[in-house]
Amino acid sequence: MRRALSYVCSSSVVFLASEYITNPQQTPCPARRKLSETMDPYKYLNIRLNPDGSLSRNGEAKLLPPAPSGELIAVTSASADGPARRIVHSNDLPLDDAKGTSVRLFVPAGVGDGASSRLPLILYFHGGGYVLFRAASEPFHNTAAVLAATVPAAVASVDYRLAPEHRLPAAFDDAADAVRWVRSYAAGSPGRPVFIMGCHNGASIAFRAALAAADQGLELRGLILNQAHHSGVERTAAENASVDDRVLPLPANDLLWELALPFAADRDHEYCNPETMLAGVSKARLRKLPPCLVLGRKKDPPRDRQRVLVAALREAGVDVEARMDGAGFHAMELFKPNCAAEFNAQVADFVRRHAGDHGVEVHAARSRL
């Protein structure tokens, strides 16, 4: 059995810090940089665009193998239940062999009395601006494992295709494939509560996956959007203030979109600008979405765009629980142990409240550990 979740920080890109999950020592926040519009975003992101259009990702986080025999997860939760330790098993399952996509499935052991087949299922999409990281990348493997242990739930982390090798809508197409996979997986245990969740750009993928689920007739209990990554041609106040942002400086943010969007598309494309995206989605279709938990932070550059999405969902009649005033910056849960614990507790609380009777059963089982 693997003792999981070691520290990694191999790039200037601050997404790579993941020690927050189990290390009692606080992961240091990235130092403030004096950046300008003339900064080299390729150097900042530690990437190189090759002549054939592929990308060399020179600062990638370590890729972790799955742990079918289990890894020991020690979680310090912000909830009243206090610390918990669980073994979480993980396996890679094919999604589409032709596309090279897969799902890494995390399942916690020892929850309740043989009820693992009825645990809530969370379909999870990782962050990285559509360009960086995999489901196996250490920070996001760790995030999924801790969520599986903390909620507790089965967490299916989607290894979707990355840009620029596979520009949008490739990741959205992979999300639709993942929804079809969930329908098949959930069919084996009728009544299993299903949730869709994404962090950062993964939140934008999760939103489209939830629409696909509604179109496919898959019942969802909830949708969790953590700091959704959006932009647009005309700068918002938050974006104008983010030129020297410690995590997502404006030039690096612009480059991520340039690499992710279809050729010749600008940031007002529907894949990027929430106003353009929402213009193409009817209120009747939005109304089919399940209850939503939307998380944001006061210093997150896309926060103004996130509020646009929240307003549109509420106007359509969607049950939205918006917590947009969290302290700190983009992806802060990857740096501060207390923020990680708070984030995990928020997700766990939302899942328990919307999972129905089974959510109460799981909560009681966790309290006995």
What is the meaning of each model-derived region?
Residues 10-17:
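Cleavable N-terminal signal peptides of Sec/SRP-targeted secreted and luminal proteins
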